[in-house]
Amino acid sequence: YNFNYKNTTLPKMYLTGDTTNMTHEQTVPMGIEYISPNEDKYGQSFNTGIQNNPVRIQGTSSLQYVRHNYTIFLKDEYGADMFYNPYGEGSVAENVFCLKADYIESSHANNTGMAKFINDCVYDTKTPMQSENPNCRTTINGFPIEVYINGEYMGVYNFNHDRYSTKSLGYDYKKYPNMLVYEINSNSNVSAGAFYKYG
């Protein structure tokens, strides 16, 4: 109970706005306030102030679950992309993030935890982008966070890079025309047709 409802050590994110029409394809504008209890670990707090940040449901097979994942796009007060880095050294500023519920695996270890382990400890071959900027990554980064939507406590999520966090992952077809990036349209689809080119 205290961990979930009286926690002072985890960052908190508050999303405010009408979610009626939100789907995995349709964004809705929301206000976003982020409260960091420790700037060294979790970056600076911020409040976008107005409801102009596009937010949509994220995922494929997870769409059926009670708790959804969300992709958030940070915007400043003028509607321009707002770049932010809550992860510190080893990451770059982004404007696209994922709030990951990890509903089936609530320890939050196998998704972000495994990705961080692979990026930091296992895979040491550098991509072209990493050769230019060592803070770019081959996997997502993230940490646990409490999420509230319109005042309702949604639970402990992971505050991750999104798969469309192009600055962090080095997706630049103009700069690297031979780059190959593929997505899988569903975790349950193992056919060749499940793969499609990103971008």
Tell where the protein language model's regions lie, with residue ranges.
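Phosphate/dinucleotide-binding and metal-coordinating scaffold of catalytic cores
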Residues: Y1-G199
